[in-house]
Amino acid sequence: MMMPANYSVIAENEMTYVNGGANFIDAIGAVTAPIWTLDNVKTFNTNIVTLVGNTFLQSTINRTIGVLFSGNTTWKEVGNIGKNLFGTNVKGNPIEKNNFGDYAMNALGIAAAVYNLGVAPTKNTVKETEVKFTV
């Protein structure tokens, strides 16, 4: 069978490039599709959430439970928990007004920290060490 002069046999993912350019996601997908399974993607996403949550965990605890159990809690401090939690970044610096990106990333970090508290057991000092009583 004779093919037209402008016809060539190429793969479908290359045809995307001919028709207007391959995008980055298609290129990564073509390379990683044989390697990454659904389990790999799930593990990767879980690990990212865990890393972000670990970064925000201590500051989230300090700005919520730490305020309540500090020993010198006032109602004003309790009322400011939300402002301090969502208005300051993980380093404790205030987030600039109208900086939606930082507010959103801060909220996602706090959500990841709460997720970590919900899915993994915390270290129990009493369980892992010997507690001695002296009389």
Curated annotation (Swiss-Prot):
Protein name from the UniProt record: Microbial anti-inflammatory molecule
Subcellular location: Secreted
Species per Swiss-Prot/TrEMBL record: Faecalibacterium duncaniae (strain DSM 17677 / JCM 31915 / A2-165)
Function: Plays an anti-inflammatory role in the mammalian intestine. The supernatant of this bacteria, or 2 purified fractions containing peptides derived from this protein, exerts inhibitory effects on IL1-beta-induced IL-8 secretion in intestinal epithelial CaCO-2 cells. Mice fed this bacterium suffer less severe symptoms in 2,4,6-trinitrobenzenesulphonic acid (TNBS)-induced colitis. Expression in human epithelial cell lines (HEK293T, HT29) shows a decrease in activation of NF-kappa-B induced by Carma-1 (CARD11) or lipopolysaccharide. The decrease occurs in a MAM-dose dependent manner.
Annotated coiled-coil segments of the chain: none
Alphabetical keyword list: Secreted
Note in the entry: Crohn disease is an inflammatory bowel disease. This commensal, butyrate-producing bacterium, isolated from a human fecal sample, is reduced in some patients suffering from Crohn disease. In a mouse model of diabetes mellitus there is a significantly reduced population of Faecalibacterium.
Induction of synthesis: Transcribed in the gut of mice with diabetes mellitus (db/db mice).
GO cellular component: extracellular region
